[in-house]
Regions:
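Bacterial N-terminal signal peptides
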Residues: 11-21
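C-terminal-biased regions
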Residues: 28-56, 67-152
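Bacterial N-terminal signal peptides that target proteins for export
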Residues: 1-13
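Generic macromolecular interface patches on structured domains
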Residues: 2-5, 18, 76, 101
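Sec/Tat signal peptide C-region and signal peptidase I cleavage site
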Residues: 23-27
Length: 152
């Protein structure tokens, strides 16, 4: 019995050490996130204000501000269904159905260093919301950041 307790303790210790060694690889600084956005999208500085507005609006259930950050039309996945949102007013009128309380809380707590960035855009709240740089012209010389995906 003493031998098996020692073996279990040793195995548990090895697992803890393994996770401790891996954990820092997932941590990233604000600067690393900024650099990744800049590398993939080229306009990291322009994300700051829309992102802050989104986080604050989710905290305060400000449907109008969130609606103004969306690129329309937008397909929203919520409550096991898909909704095609055509306008700001459509979004505001259906806000409580389209954005769950859980998503509002998660986005409202979003930290910049916890953003996930890939070529599709910037993911918030484990994929509940995505923002992307949306081209304003054919050459994509001008773009703006907008909500492009909502998955509750």
């Amino acid at each position: 019995l003493e031998f098996s307790v020692h073996r279990i303790t040793s195995a548990l210790f090895a697992v803890i050490i393994a996770f401790t060694a891996v954990t820092p690889a997932f941590a990233q600084s604000d600067q690393e996130v900024y650099n990744r956005i800049e590398q993939l999208h080229g306009n990291a500085r322009q994300l700051d204000q829309p992102l802050r507005s989104l986080v604050e609006a989710m905290r305060s259930d400000d449907a109008q501000t969130i609606a103004g950050l969306i690129e329309y039309p937008l397909t929203v996945k919520a409550n096991g269904e898909e909704y095609e949102i055509q306008s700001e007013q459509d979004f505001v009128d259906n806000f409580d159905t389209l954005i769950s309380a859980q998503t509002r809380r998660a986005v409202g707590r979003q930290q910049y260093s916890d953003l996930f960035v890939n070529s599709d855009g910037v993911m918030l709240a484990d994929g509940a919301v995505w923002m992307a740089a949306v081209c304003e012209d054919d050459d994509c010389d001008n773009s703006h950041w907008a909500i492009t995906v909502i998955n509750n």
